Amino acid sequence: MGKIKALLDTNIVIDFLNQREPFYEQARLLMIAGRVGEFDLWISSSQVTDLIYILSEGGKPSLIPETRERIQGLRTFVSVFAVSEREIDKMLASSWKDPEDRLLFEVALSIQADCIITRNKADFESDLVRALDCDEFFTWLRTDSTSTTTQ
C-alpha cells in the first residue's frame, strides 16, 4: 500500500495562505500533517498561476514578490503535477460546467489521488475520486483510509 495522495483544491490552499476564516485552522492542520509526511499533498501546475493571480489581488506588481515567496514555502511540502495535453483534452471534451474543476479532477486521476480536498464537494461528484472537506479527510484517515488507499 502506498502513501495517501491528496489533491488540494485551490480554495483550500487560499484558506491556508491567506489565513481565511473560518477555514484556516483546518487547512493549517492539513498542511502541518502533510509537511511531516503523514500523506502526500499535491496541486497542479495550472493552480500555481491561479494562486499567484488570486493572492496578488489580480497580479498587482507590488504583491508578486511576497506571493512568490509564499508559494515557494508551500512547495517545500506540496508536490506539483505538470498538467499535460491529456488532462487539457479530457477537460475540453467534458460536459462539466466548471472547466477548472474538471481539469483538477483529471489531474487527480493522473496522479492516482485517493481524494480531492475541497470545500466545494458538489463540484467533484464522481465515483472515481472521492471529494472530501478537511474534517471529512481527517475522519477518513482515522477510520478507513488504510483499507481503501490505492497502489
Each predicted region: which residue ranges?
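Short, well-structured N-terminal submotif of metal-dependent ribonuclease cores
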Residues: 1-43, 59-63, 126, 138-151
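Active-site-proximal, substrate-binding regions of enzyme catalytic domains
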Residues: 28-31, 35, 40, 46-96, ...
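Active-site neighborhoods of divalent-metal-dependent phosphate/nucleic-acid chemistry enzymes
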Residues: 76-121, 148-150
